[in-house]
Amino acid sequence: MGKGLALDIGGTKIAAAVVTESGMLIGRQQIATPRGGAGQLAAALETLIAPYRHQVDFIAVASTGIISGGRLTALNPANLGGLADFPLYDCIRSISDLPCVLLNDGQAAAWAEYQALGDKNDNMMFVTVSTGVGGGIILNKKLLVGQRGLAGHIGHTLSDPHGVLCGCGRRGCVESVASGTAIGAETLGWKQPVSAATVFDMAQQGDAQAGKVINRSAAAIAQMLADMKMALDLEVVILGGSVGLAVGYLERVVAAQKTLPGIYRVPVQEAHHRQDSGLLGAALWARTSL
């Protein structure tokens, strides 16, 4: 099929790269995800797509949110600056008439990471801990998308029934406890609130308060993995996202798993493709779909 342009729309950034037939990413770039509504998102997509209209054969998009019927619907609109619904396919087709395939970003990343594992596993899951918490599931060697595109929205499984209200409208979702947004929100009661990135820096320097906040996130992820292992008989979990790939986070998740009975534990490893799993996965999926 030749080269494709892959896009990865996240809550914090939109990344783009040309993906060759051999799976190499060329000219990777990223911009901040606009927070000003549909018009700004459309303009950002045009900025990234327009220069490549005559250089690639297809467009592949991995995006946060529910991807169904060509639309992006946000379970937690706060992750996209309040944008709840966006005609993603129509927007891209208005910029370019190239063939276009859309997929949820967690699903796309799961597909790329599954390919990287080789043919060793039947059931695996990709987990992204970033602005929000999401994922993608491979079951019996097949990517689980779902009739409505919901499969893999593991950040909206329950962590604490008495917890804070999640942006999706339910109380105590994993995302409201474990995400980068939640980590930052935990510092609002501090003398000087800081970002999630700063919390990790503080923890690296031995700050006990910062370490406690990160441990709470890691424990929520470990409990969620235990639930998903029991539901899906997972063989391995791949961890990604800005929080998931932060120094020391994987080790904290593994430590939290060790407090559970052995049957609830599942091997966890960092994403092979790091921050590019979504880009590559979208392109790989498009090649199977077009």
Curated annotation (Swiss-Prot):
Keywords: ATP-binding, Carbohydrate metabolism, Kinase, Metal-binding, Nucleotide-binding, Transferase, Zinc. The keyword Nucleotide-binding applies. Signal peptide: none annotated. InterPro entries: ATPase_NBD (IPR043129), ManNAc_kinase_bac (IPR023945), ROK (IPR000600), ROK_cs (IPR049874). The keyword ATP-binding applies. Pathway: Amino-sugar metabolism; N-acetylneuraminate degradation; D-fructose 6-phosphate from N-acetylneuraminate: step 2/5. It catalyses: an N-acyl-D-mannosamine + ATP = an N-acyl-D-mannosamine 6-phosphate + ADP + H(+). Pfam families: ROK (PF00480). Zn(2+) binds at H156, C166, C168, C173. One of its GO terms (biological process) is N-acetylneuraminate catabolic process. One of its GO terms (molecular function) is zinc ion binding. ATP binds at residues 6-13, 132-139. Homodimer. Belongs to the ROK (NagC/XylR) family. NanK subfamily. Catalyzes the phosphorylation of N-acetylmannosamine (ManNAc) to ManNAc-6-P. This is N-acetylmannosamine kinase. It comes from Yersinia pestis. The lineage of its organism: Bacteria, Pseudomonadati, Pseudomonadota, Gammaproteobacteria, Enterobacterales.
